[in-house]
Amino acid sequence: MNDCLRCQLAESRLKRDWNAVPGKGSKTAPIVLVSDAPIKAESINREPMAGYYGMVLDRVLKAVPLDRNLLWIDNLCKCVPLDEKGKFRSAYVDDEVKKCLPYFDQTMEEIKPKIIVALGDAALKFLSGNRKMNIRKNHGQLYWSEKYKCHLMGVFHPKVILAEYEFIKYMVQDFKKIKEFLEKGETKPTDVNYVFARDKQLLNQVLDQLSKQTEFVYDIETTGLNFLTDKILCIGFSWGEYSG
């Protein structure tokens, strides 16, 4: 991997005598944690989630608790992405990550995990194939990856916890969901029959449907984590299993 010259990141890696960062963990791991790209500490140590990031991860795993031996830890991009001034940046999805992706794909073929956990916004956007994904809004939600034939969940990256430590509670909550998922052994989720009320006529149909129910549930999606102050994106209703 250190001989890789597939993209422009190889030049900065060789110039600084840094390393490409391989994945690490158990090749029988049911859980794969993956970030978009490594940082300097990971490149020097040739180990993903090294340094302070690893300390945050260990604290989260201890709080759950979840055994580290159940994890394979990796990066979509194997080299440290730097800007023109030599400062760390996120990997470019359309170039650097795509050229590096065969390494990750091969590893997933070998491991065949039950769930891939995307650490941070960039990794979640790429693995889900949805640029509109937002880690603050979509963290902890379970999706299905047709490409990797396993489930996918996004969680906060440890760098977010280092900047805003109170967010560690959300990371712990999400990892508890992952543990629960493994214990229950859920299968691919059934498609939900959604009706989207984008105009007045459809809205009236939905309201008419709701008025006939003895009970229903609802969920409010907002632009952030504080539903009391953030703007409302949509209000979802369900009046039966796999309907909304």
Where are the model-predicted features located?
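Conserved RNase H-like, two-metal-ion catalytic cores of nucleic-acid enzymes
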Residues: 41-42, 46-48, 52, 57, ...
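A polyanion-binding, active-site-adjacent surface
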Residues: 1-186
